[in-house]
Amino acid sequence: VNDPALSMTCEWWKQLFGESEGKEDKGLLPMDTCYSEDLHSLGQFVQDGSPILFETFLSLRDSGSSYVLHPDDVNDGFSYVDGKDFSEINKAAYDATLSAHSKRFPCLIMEMDRMDEETFGSLFYFFQFACYVSCNITGVNPFDQNGVEDYKRDMFRLLGK
């Protein structure tokens, strides 16, 4: 994601796909990154590591907020962003990241106008349906969680439950 407003949606998405698909040595490992925050940590792997992934870019066309960086007297090397809105800076980071990453592996793009109730509901429905279809294609039951039950059983035993 390139907008922090979507980060908790990604936490839900990780649980949905990890818990539904991750069975019987099948499924994809879901992870999320919030660009530009994660460009140096996970971005390094994406750019130069093993190309074992595909990436979904999830973004909002209208973040619903605006903040313009005002010039100051500090010579910090960032004067090139003076007068620019954060949304413009985030869009440049998004475009540059998509351009670089799409040279190495497939990138899916999901852009939404805004994050309102209708869009949020549509996004949830889309991912739930996609997860269900994926599980059916790979032949796993999306509704059980045997792997989770293993650690819970051990934890409860260790705690005397």
What are these regions (language model features)?
Residues 1-161:
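A SIS-like phosphosugar-recognition module
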